[in-house]
Amino acid sequence: MSKTHLTEQKFSDFALHPAVIEALEKKGFHNCTPIQALALPLTLEGRDVAGQAQTGTGKTMAFLTSTFHYLLSHPAIADRQVNQPRALIMAPTRELAVQIHADAEPLAQATGLKLGLAYGGDGYDKQLKVLESGVDILIGTTGRLIDYAKQNHINLGAIQVVVLDEADRMYDLGFIKDIRWLFRRMPPATQRLNMLFSATLSYRVRELAFEQMNNAEYVEVEPEQKTGHRIKEELFYPSNEEKMRLLQTLLEEEWPDRAIVFANTKHRCEDIWGHLAADGHRVGLLTGDVAQKKRLRILEEFTRGDLDILVATDVAARGLHIPAVTHVFNYDLPDDCEDYVHRIGRTGRAGASGHSISLACEEYALNLPAIETYIGHSIPVSKYNPDALMTDLPKPLRLTRARPGNGPRRNGPPRNRRRSG
């Protein structure tokens, strides 16, 4: 893999449909990332692809470009009905489905192909109204897709392109039976273009590719190191009593443009949110207990820059592409080594640099040896002066008194406490 994020390969070098090239160039996409440069020559020949790549390497645009080109270059199945989409893109989470849909919209506007979105939690009738008007490309989560299929709101008999994104995550979340249910209602694999992407091409993912794809070509983009060479990693050893004050002091010193703070439990996340919101930070909370509409709103606010900090459990650690995240704080070291990689992979994306700061407290420091073995290197340790930690901190807010994402807006350093570093 090249040390630069982009390759010398240009999208315009491929025999892509002119409308697709126009849409890509309008969005500023000229050169391919490594996964795009490997996958597109195969998909443009109509060959199935199973791809392994880190998140943030451009795999979404790889399968969207392939999907739009294929549909524009091949006629729809004869006698296709209005409830029959031509392409199906399956994602493990609602947030990822929404994100893929947003990434696809510029291509849809340029090509005239219609998009549909289907995910659980809310919006059943709103989503259905779009489907009833007919869509070419349907993006969704498996549960809602099956619901619509059982009600005959959609029929998969005219599918020409299938994409399975975050396949390993599908297994982790127990969706594999749903995936197979949907595949059984499509035309045979030999009559479709099939694409699968995954952070890892494990045995079970390869088994799925063998089962549901047509002699898939495997393409892999291995990072130079699991954590990405553009991410500065840093580790502190705080006591449990000093942990929160250290986090707040680091936030004052670093003053990140956009940061995600990860913790291992929803209760810990709620506690962190309460401390940061009370201290005047523009902070949002993202856990499994947050209602779907609110989760999407918080993600939109964070992406727009209306929120500076997102406190999250690992529900947000995979699949979400939030641009320009400058810092990731591991308030708790994760129990799963892979979660460490996925967490800090929120920063340092698409060629940008990033900063990851981890707190190895008394409770979770035991997780560190396994993490360092997994990533293949020791995380550099930094020391702090306990006497220099912030002390004039307000009482934390409680969720019953304030809603996540609605903390006081931060127009400058709270009470002029910005540190010189």
From Swiss-Prot:
A motif (DEAD box) lies at residues 165-168. Residues 245-390 form the Helicase C-terminal domain. It is an enzyme of class 3 (hydrolase). It catalyses: ATP + H2O = ADP + phosphate + H(+). Residues 403-414 have a biased composition (Low complexity). One of its GO terms (biological process) is RNA catabolic process. SMART domains: DEXDc, HELICc. Residues 396-421 are annotated as: Disordered. A motif (Q motif) lies at residues 9-37. Belongs to the DEAD box helicase family. RhlB subfamily. Component of the RNA degradosome, which is a multiprotein complex involved in RNA processing and mRNA degradation. This is ATP-dependent RNA helicase RhlB. The lineage of its organism: Bacteria, Pseudomonadati, Pseudomonadota, Gammaproteobacteria, Enterobacterales. The gene is rhlB.
